[in-house]
Amino acid sequence: MSAHLYIEGAQSKTDQILCRRAFSALLKDAGLERMPRLTASGPRNAAFDAFKTAHANRKSGDFIAMLVDSEDPVADLEQPWTHLKKRDNWNRPAGAEDDQALLMTTCMETWIVADRDGLKEHYGHKLQCAALPPLHALESRHRHDVHDKLEHATRNCSNAYRKGKRSFEVLETLSATTLSQLPSFARLLRVLKNRL
């Protein structure tokens, strides 16, 4: 049996390497005994296309999944295909299960801002914690609000937050234990631990 996770993000080869390294570090920190093969697939539509192709060509027993931003709050994390159909008009591939669609709710930046200690360690004393979005109901916040507040809170830091290389550098340093408080991250870990 093999396992493969297609991840949204990282268009350049360098960023794809950083993306894989960051998610690998995060999953190892979560204590996964087996690791899926990780592929940084570029934009979310490209991740979905790569997932569909791999799902169609899978061997018996293989676990193929994708991890994409939900882009909007999710009514029911256990029914991601319903959300993806409503939001993106993505049809669930034949034979695909809900466990194969994993969501970062509402975006990867939500996971990043959830670990305040990790952010302080990564950005140092110039991080403006008061400018970050409140932790309460974090996954119900609009992705642009989360992203903009993260950029604003780090604007005076020498390594101010930007999508791409810098986003993966900070993601790699986050605590899986802290992120486990987020329902979407907890679901990712539960699914991977059950399926690997």
Q: In which residue ranges do the predicted regions lie?
A:
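Short hydrophobic beta-strand that contains or immediately precedes a catalytic carboxylate
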Residues: 5-7
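Short, conserved secondary-structure transition motifs
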Residues: 42-46
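C-terminal accessory helical subdomains adjacent to catalytic cores in phosphodiester-
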Residues: 1-2, 13, 17-38, 48-196
